[in-house]
């Protein structure tokens, strides 16, 4: 009897030791998993929280578009967007640079409580590439200098682009491509005496152009309405309806004559 009791006690002790061993292994495995998860998770979280550069000049990246503009040079005067960003910028490069190119690069520049892009007098900005300039409740562009738009999608809930000619300076704009959407597409800055010279050579325009912009010239483009456009048309162009989308295209007018032609035989006179 004693022998059986001893064997039973030994089995209980063995089972207890085995259970403790299994439990200890489980505890160790649990904390190992937690440790590994933390090692993998927290660096990823830290990486995700780190601010990323939004613009590039040459081979150098910057945390803001404005900072990138300030680091342009005669050799590298193109600022390329690297991601969507919310920032209102002013074209103020270093003193030796009089103009820059903003390459949208498929990204969006969203206004931040002010006009999205301001071009001061005696500065030049060229906008290229696909992407967006979003004014929101502010204009997309205020220009007192020179502006060239060669691509992009521009939107605003108010006047989209504003220009100015004052006693000492005059804006100059040339738009050859892009999509432009706003209640009012073009207007004057508050202190402007005149619009300044602006020419539209191409692009798609959804919105109104007001009357009285005496130095606006329309040479091309597609417009959602013909209202007020006729006085701005360049010589020898007209508005042609596009039946597919309800737009009106500016095209060169063909010259034709209603007078019959008369063929003269050799030696004959009229």
Give the location of each predicted region.
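N-terminal secretory signal peptides that target proteins for export/translocation
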Residues: 1-21
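Sec-dependent signal peptide cleavage junction
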Residues: 37-53
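Acidic Gly/Asp/Thr-rich repetitive segments characteristic of extracellular carbohydrate-active
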Residues: 51-80, 86, 254-270
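Hydrophobic core
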Residues: 28-40
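N-terminal extracellular ligand-recognition/capping segment immediately after the signal peptide
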Residues: 76-115
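Surface-exposed loop/turn motifs in large extracellular/passenger domains
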Residues: 91-103, 118-134, 142-157, 163-183, ...
